Amino acid sequence: MRVVSSLFLPVLLAEVWLVSSFNLSSHSPEAPIRLVSQDYENQTWEEYEWADPRDDNEYWLRASQQLSNETSSFGFSLLRKISMRHDGNVIFSPFGLSVAMVNLMLGAKGETKVQVENGLNLQALSQAGPLILPALFKRVKETFSSNKKLGLTQGSFAFIHKDFEIKKTYFNLSTMYFDTEYVPTNFRNSSQARGLMNHYINKETEGKIPKLFDEINPETKLILVDYILFKGKWLTPFDPIFTEADTFHLDKYKAVKVPMMYREGNFASTFDKKFRCHILKLPYQGNATMLVVLMEKSGDHLALEDYLTTDLVEMWLQDMKTRKMEVFFPKFKLNQRYEMHELLKQVGIRRIFSTSADLSELSAVARNLQVSKVVQQSVLEVDERGTEVVSGTVSEITAYCMPPVIKVDRPFHFIIYEEMSQMLLFLGRVVNPTVL
């Protein structure tokens, strides 16, 4: 088994596909991106040169905290939607999906834009200004980028059909706030387009996702891809010498053998008496943390998801105590792909996927333009050195004498977040660590 050099790697890719019924004139594959100048637009971004609405650092701190809370709530809601479709392993990024949708929202107007804001739980924040959401995400991304120990790399590609005209304002805003790299693409030649896009994504994810695209609709006009590469190293690694094959109980009747890591040391943890679950913190270098939620009894993990909220997680964190413990934790790898557009419809984001979509801030030929797909793929690897991956009910929590051993040998949930911003980076569950 190959050992990944930097341990825990979530790789996240969020694709957004825009499809039009127009047949536009042909240009050479090398043709530059066609921008419609502002001089010829009916410009509605009056505050295009918009700066921070306030210079008050306290305001930005409060707004960033609210952004993190709402992104977490959005993530927990999506987890419940995913669980309605299947009960297996899960890994996705609420942060990555929110970034992709807010990037796209720069091109939306009217009810189309409002539905995206509401679906992401960001309608209250957006009232501060037309570009407050992109500005907030930009600040968060810059904070991550400046923290080299965090090991988080992000980026955005826009594969745009060679003769599709986008508004200069959208081009500039998406570049300014999301560092979007635009790549001219001939979607009429689907095999060429597929090869080009897979080449870019394979390179940026360091080979973790070599073939993201299979089939390409020749009517596609724009594909947005946001990616996150997280190479988290445990603050205190597990020693591979102590890793041994052990039993992981899938349920009361089935079990599998997995490589089980072991470490003795000081761990922050607590126990929720109401939900009967252990909560364990596994810190990374660079102020990131994996929170492991392990039910006391095997088979109860799905029931917990109905009650997961930002308030509940905050209570867990506040109640944690650091103790000397023995921890057993399985090595595993996850690779999950989700048709997020179907899930987004369930949280009220529907118009952007219909013929009623208003994307007139994105293109002057926005009539008949709609989003056909939002796809997210995440890869997560966890081993001894770390990770390498491409509002609620108050519960009674009672401090108690933690058992000397926590053995994660049954299905569990994990929450990966950045400590300073409290931003939820990845969320998921492991039901069977031997299955991708």
Swiss-Prot record:
Signal peptide per UniProt: 1-20
InterPro entries, alphabetized: PZI_serpin_dom (IPR033835), Serpin_dom (IPR023796), Serpin_fam (IPR000215), Serpin_sf (IPR036186), Serpin_sf_1 (IPR042178), Serpin_sf_2 (IPR042185)
Pfam name, any one: Serpin
Glycosylation (residues): 23, 42, 69, 172, 189, 287
GO molecular function: heparin binding; serine-type endopeptidase inhibitor activity
GO biological process terms on file: blood coagulation; liver regeneration
Keyword Glycoprotein part of the UniProt annotation: yes
Post-translational modification: Phosphorylated by FAM20C in the extracellular medium.
Predominant place of localization: secreted
One Gene Ontology cellular component annotation held by this UniProt entry: extracellular space
Subcellular locations according to the entry: Secreted
Expression by tissue: Expressed by the liver and secreted in plasma.
Keywords: Blood coagulation, Glycoprotein, Hemostasis, Heparin-binding, Protease inhibitor, Secreted, Serine protease inhibitor, Signal
Residue(s) at site: Reactive bond: 400-401
Renumbered residue ranges of the record's region Heparin-binding: 128-145
Family of this protein: Belongs to the serpin family.
Role noted for this protein: Inhibits activity of the coagulation protease factor Xa in the presence of PROZ, calcium and phospholipids. Also inhibits factor XIa in the absence of cofactors.
PANTHER family, per database record: PROTEIN Z-DEPENDENT PROTEASE INHIBITOR, SERINE PROTEASE INHIBITOR, SERPIN
Note: Heparin acts as an important cofactor, producing 20 to 100-fold accelerations of SERPINA10 reactions with factor Xa and factor XIa.
Protein name per its UniProtKB record: Protein Z-dependent protease inhibitor
Organism, as annotated: Rattus norvegicus (Rat)
Gene responsible for this protein: Serpina10
